[in-house]
Amino acid sequence: MKAFLKIFGALMLLVGSGSLAHAELTIDVTKGIQGGGIPIAIAPFAGGASENIAGIIASDLKRTGKFAPQSPDVRADYAVTGQASPGGSRGYVVRFQLAGAQGSQLLNLSFDVPPNQLRPVAHRISDLIYEKLTGEKGLSGTRIAFVTAGGGSWFLVIADADGQNPKVILRSTQPIMSPAWSPDGSRLAYVSFEGRRPQIVVQEVYTGARRTVSAAPGINGAPSWAPNGQRLAFTLSKDGNPEIYSLDLGSPNPVRLTNGSAIDTEPVWLPDGSVVFTSDRGGSPQLYRIGPGGGAAQRLTFEGSYNAKPTVSPDGRYIAMVHQRNSRFYIAVLDMKTRQFRVLTSGGLADSPTFAPNGRMIIYSDGQRLNAISVDGGVKQDFVLRGRARDPVWAPYSR
């Protein structure tokens, strides 16, 4: 069997080797911007709300690696104040203000929310502050999905980006692999081994409704959503060796995109509808690109003898991947505009990268836990989970 399929199989076995995790996550920022971040004073919110809104905002901003939250009595570049009081039509009115060092008002907004939405609105405030001061969309209000296993079961889990509010949306006595979010964040496609054979399933996140979209003989693997959310690309071996197929979700018949004697697998879509995938057609696993309907493949990677598990940033600018060097595995990124190739991580067991919806962070697993690193390598986060977690995927922004 080809080398990278051997590694794929070994990683499959590892998924089931950890103890049961109840998906309790905490996140440590292990590397931030030089200088410790932008000082920002955050005062406790008045009004006696059950959630510590100021504390959530401070944690969110600290986790970005770009801010250094301070107590309100410390001189800082920016200051956040607010109130969360019973009232309004939904239960609570939350107001906040962001001011500059000279007292200039930068933001002054209010939200009418039910009591169970105080934490989400705190994340919303964090993202508004982050975007106002950096020019980039924030990630505090987003979600992640991942797989964990133990006790003879596998779990597909969704949690907030800060690791809170984990929810198991699927429990199975057979492996679960390769979750992928739909572009609107309402569905997850994944590989399930129910019935002791691989099949590709699409599950509605909010209702739990499930639909098997491919259960062909042999391999059914690595589902990836098209940008319009109406198609999936995945790997099938029903006609012999693994090839890339595309399926219109309104049709039962997948269309074959690659055709040859090589192993073609792990497809992901670019915004223009073309597909990047892993193939050993050149003698070792490398990344290639084909058009929306297939055709001639263009090789994209030439650094080293192993580049696999591609993931594409939302704007198509970057492709992150697993890069092998000296028998160890790292996360690397290829700039599609400049063709610059950079290795971002220093560990040796990196796997399964996916981009955050703002394209600035990449989440991945390292064999024990989840990690995230910025595209420029300047910010690194460790997700501390009780037990092992694999196959992380960052959800898109809510629409």
Where are these regions (language model features)?
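Residue position within the beta-strands of beta-propeller blades
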Residues: 144-147, 187-191, 231-235, 275-278, ...
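Multi-bladed beta-propeller domains
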Residues: 160-177, 203-221, 226, 247-265, ...
